[in-house]
């Protein structure tokens, strides 16, 4: 049985999330959370939160939590916030603040 959890509009770029996500794919839930706990990246805490949410979803569904494995962590692009930075001689530079939709799929 598959269990999903999603976090939307997270303020980190999908490219950075994917680098951390590759470290936990295919691992049991406890091992994956342990790996994420010691990673310095901002997205590691975000992914850990979504994994814990998926485990809670599994408990509600009556699935044995000890047997769950992280089947996949998907980081999709969310909407981009566009900001402006003033530059020299009246110019402006666009700053793109990217967001992510993080989906975790657990499998028994």
UniProtKB/Swiss-Prot annotation:
<comment type="similarity">
    <text>Belongs to the universal ribosomal protein uL22 family.</text>
</comment>
<protein>
    <recommendedName>
        <fullName>Large ribosomal subunit protein uL22</fullName>
    </recommendedName>
</protein>
<keyword id="KW-0689">Ribosomal protein</keyword>
<dbReference type="InterPro" id="IPR047867">
    <property type="entry name" value="Ribosomal_uL22_bac/org-type"/>
</dbReference>
<dbReference type="GO" id="GO:0006412">
    <property type="term" value="P:translation"/>
</dbReference>
<keyword id="KW-0687">Ribonucleoprotein</keyword>
<comment type="subunit">
    <text>Part of the 50S ribosomal subunit.</text>
</comment>
<dbReference type="GO" id="GO:0003735">
    <property type="term" value="F:structural constituent of ribosome"/>
</dbReference>
<dbReference type="GO" id="GO:0019843">
    <property type="term" value="F:rRNA binding"/>
</dbReference>
<dbReference type="InterPro" id="IPR036394">
    <property type="entry name" value="Ribosomal_uL22_sf"/>
</dbReference>
<dbReference type="InterPro" id="IPR005727">
    <property type="entry name" value="Ribosomal_uL22_bac/chlpt-type"/>
</dbReference>
<dbReference type="Pfam" id="PF00237">
    <property type="entry name" value="Ribosomal_L22"/>
</dbReference>
<comment type="function">
    <text>The globular domain of the protein is located near the polypeptide exit tunnel on the outside of the subunit, while an extended beta-hairpin is found that lines the wall of the exit tunnel in the center of the 70S ribosome.</text>
</comment>
<dbReference type="InterPro" id="IPR018260">
    <property type="entry name" value="Ribosomal_uL22_CS"/>
</dbReference>
<dbReference type="GO" id="GO:0022625">
    <property type="term" value="C:cytosolic large ribosomal subunit"/>
</dbReference>
<dbReference type="InterPro" id="IPR001063">
    <property type="entry name" value="Ribosomal_uL22"/>
</dbReference>
<keyword id="KW-0694">RNA-binding</keyword>
<comment type="function">
    <text>This protein binds specifically to 23S rRNA; its binding is stimulated by other ribosomal proteins, e.g. L4, L17, and L20. It is important during the early stages of 50S assembly. It makes multiple contacts with different domains of the 23S rRNA in the assembled 50S subunit and ribosome.</text>
</comment>
<keyword id="KW-0699">rRNA-binding</keyword>
């Amino acid at each position: 049985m598959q269990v999903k959890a999603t976090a939307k509009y997270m303020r980190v770029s999908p490219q950075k999330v994917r680098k951390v996500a590759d470290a936990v794919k295919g691992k049991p839930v406890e091992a994956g959370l342990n790996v994420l706990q010691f990673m310095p990246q901002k997205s590691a805490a975000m992914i850990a939160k979504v994994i814990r949410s998926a485990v809670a979803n599994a408990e509600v569904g009556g699935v044995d939590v000890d047997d769950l494995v992280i089947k996949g962590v998907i980081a999709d692009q969310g909407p981009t916030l566009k900001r402006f930075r003033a530059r020299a001689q009246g110019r402006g530079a666009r700053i793109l603040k990217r967001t992510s939709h993080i989906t975790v799929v657990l499998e028994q």
